[in-house]
Amino acid sequence: MGDSTKKAETAKDEGTSQERREARPLPTAADFEGKDTSENTDGRAADADGEMSLERRLDSLREFLRERRGAIRVTNPGLETGRPRLQLAENMRPDPTNPYNRPSIEALSRIKPIAISNNMATSEDMMRIYVNLEGLGVPTEHVQQVVIQAVLFCKDASSSVFLDPRGSFEWPRGAITADAVLAVLKKDAETLRRVCRLYAPVTWNHMLTHNAPPADWAAMGFQYEDRFAAFDCFDYVENTAAVQPLEGLIRRPTPREKVAHNTHKDIAVRGANRNQVFSSLNAEVTGGMNGPELTRDYVKSNRK
């Protein structure tokens, strides 16, 4: 009886279990299609993101290459102007109140160089000359032209304080005597030669432009190759304190021209200074005669 009861219960459980299995709905095709659609959507989104990333990288590469392309390539860069200023350490900072302060190269670079020569007319001298020439009737816009004409005149004649000029300097619809102009230059610049030195580079370029060396170059003993060196202020052509031509010097003086000029200057100075041996020019000292000729033996310069 017990066995039959167990069999009946077992059969009942199996029947109930079968009913439950029969009651569970079976998966349909739509269930599988939805799962595939979700997976496909995620895959397509990942592919799209990858494509967009590649496009962005290509765009960045394109812009990078565009920035680097061009017909200009700067080589041998050595830029100093506009560089970032250095920040010195606390214990290296300068003390401008101490006379023994050691200035750095950075500090020295901020002090602009100013070329100055005491042997030529200053800006104040030239302003006096300009104002006085205006007062004599020279139009303001033609004052520099007159001054340059005077300097070129001295290139041919002389820049000596004993120069007695002839002629006149002209401008459109006007002229002024050379005596008047050179008198102003001598008075306001102390000597005429100081003004001529100031315009020596301008004189040099003018001679080369017109192939017009000093008129007396042959009489002064210069050779043809050195003729452009035959004026008083030749040794100031390369002086940076002088008035510079707009484009710069056409060419620099040659060593041969410098030798020729210095040789002639030495001879001329010794000839002019022969009376400097006297402490007084009174007749009791000079005897009414010029001093002895100052000579120099140039032959020894070639001996070894």
Swiss-Prot record:
Top-level taxon of the source organism: Viruses
Entry keyword annotation includes Ribonucleoprotein: yes
Sequence segments annotated as region (Disordered): 1-54
Compositionally biased tracts (Basic and acidic residues): 1-24, 32-54
First-listed, main subcellular location of the protein, grouped into a coarse class: virion
Localization annotation: Virion
Keywords of the record: Capsid protein, Helical capsid protein, Ribonucleoprotein, Virion
Keyword RNA-binding in annotation: no
Cellular component, GO, one term: helical viral capsid
Molecular function per GO: structural molecule activity
Further remark: The N- and the C-terminus of this capsid protein may be exposed on the surface of the virus particle. The central core sequence may be important in maintaining correct tertiary structure of the capsid protein and/or play a role in interacting with the viral RNA.
Family under the similarity heading: Belongs to the potexviruses coat protein family.
Function: Required for genome encapsidation. Forms ribonucleoprotein complexes along with TGB1 helicase and viral RNA.
Protein name, as recorded: Capsid protein
Record organism: Potato virus M (strain Russian) (PVM)
Highest classification ranks of the organism: Viruses, Riboviria, Orthornavirae, Kitrinoviricota, Alsuviricetes
